[in-house]
């Protein structure tokens, strides 16, 4: 059964720019999918459709059986409870510690403090920051900040982890460390969709690769690769 279905999707902005044109993608539960393409190719727009940051101009986007394109704004929070989202720029709150940043994602659930602590510490340990749970973001490296971002995204055990250029600001060694964490999360059953420019990661992990070029899905390969001439 497919956890995500994108059917005949078009996205055109008010300025007349067409970001996506007739996109069709099916993603089964437990998959790991890289979405690649050059800058302004439309790959980030496709990612944003999945968590309803954007709405399609035409077509349908199903996530967990729900057509998110028709979801009313007041219902979007229910969709995002099922998702974990990791951004390129971390989006951490600088005045909160590692623990507090991760716990912040659970505030809306009204969970008992004991359960919150258990979930938060488990997520922090999974990303390898157990010894730094009291540290503030300014005292962490870029890679450590991204680990916090991942912990926050997975603290409520989402069915889907959406990563939009999660290694874009990191050096190659740190990027591989972050990718190892994301891959392990996938191996534990979480579906992962990751937009990336990182050729080395794509070529090393040999996952399914979807290529977007000028708003068009031009290739979709199992165990694909990132080839420079193919990207252009």
Spans of features found by a protein language model:
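Conserved ABC transporter NBD signature motif
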Residues: 59-67, 79
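Short coil-to-helix segment of the ABC ATPase nucleotide-binding domain corresponding to the Q-loop/switch region
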Residues: 96-104
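Catalytic Walker B motif of ABC-type/P-loop ATPase nucleotide-binding domains
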Residues: 161-164
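Helix N-cap at the start of a conserved alpha-helix in ABC-type nucleotide-binding domains
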Residues: 172-174
């Amino acid at each position: 059964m497919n956890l995500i279905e994108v059917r005949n999707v078009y996205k055109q902005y008010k300025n007349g720019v067409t970001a996506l044109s007739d996109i069709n993608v099916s993603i089964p539960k437990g998959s790991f999918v890289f979405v690649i393409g050059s800058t302004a190719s439309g790959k980030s727009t496709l990612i944003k459709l999945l968590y309803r940051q954007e709405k399609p101009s035409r077509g349908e986007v199903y996530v967990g059986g729900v057509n998110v394109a028709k979801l009313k704004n007041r219902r979007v929070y229910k969709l995002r409870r099922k998702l974990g989202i990791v951004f390129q720029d971390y989006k951490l709150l600088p005045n909160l510690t590692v623990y507090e940043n991760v716990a912040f994602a659970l505030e809306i659930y009204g969970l008992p403090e004991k359960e919150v602590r258990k979930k938060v510490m488990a997520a922090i340990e999974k990303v390898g920051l157990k010894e730094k749970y009291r540290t503030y973001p300014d005292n962490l490296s870029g890679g450590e900040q991204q680990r916090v971002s991942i912990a926050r995204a997975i603290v409520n055990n989402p069915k889907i982890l959406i990563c939009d250029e999660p290694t874009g600001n990191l050096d190659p060694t740190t990027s591989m460390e972050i990718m190892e964490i994301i891959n392990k999360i996938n191996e534990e059953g979480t579906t992962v969709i990751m937009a990336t420019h990182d050729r080395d990661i794509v070529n090393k992990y040999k996952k399914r690769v979807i290529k977007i070029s000028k708003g068009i899905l031009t290739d979709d390969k199992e165990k694909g690769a990132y080839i420079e001439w193919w990207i252009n």
